[in-house]
Amino acid sequence: GQGERKMRLDKYLKVSRLIKRRTVANDACDAARITVNGKSAKASYQVKTGDIIEIAFGQRTMKVEVLEIAEHALKADAAGMYREIL
């Protein structure tokens, strides 16, 4: 096998457009507003497919499953990098 693709959490959040700016993603990680698989995750966490990311946006929490990891995603493709779990 060629090994799993991984990507830093802050970068994944930006490329997938879950969070528009990487600095915001970093701050969210630092403030422990982001968990991966139920555990608080730092910006340097290596995201892999199948991970469940939860992001707390004020009153709302968004929970997504990582479907794919791509270095660069066009806006149309970005949504395909994850699926929201309701």
Annotate each language-model stretch with its function.
Residues 7-49:
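A basic, amphipathic helix-loop patch mediating RNA/tRNA/ribosome contacts
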Residues 52:
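Glycine-rich, charged/polar anion/phosphate-binding loops
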Residues 59-86:
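C-terminal structural segments of small proteins and small subunits
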Residues 1-6:
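Short, Lys/Arg-enriched N-terminal segments with co-localized hydrophobic residues
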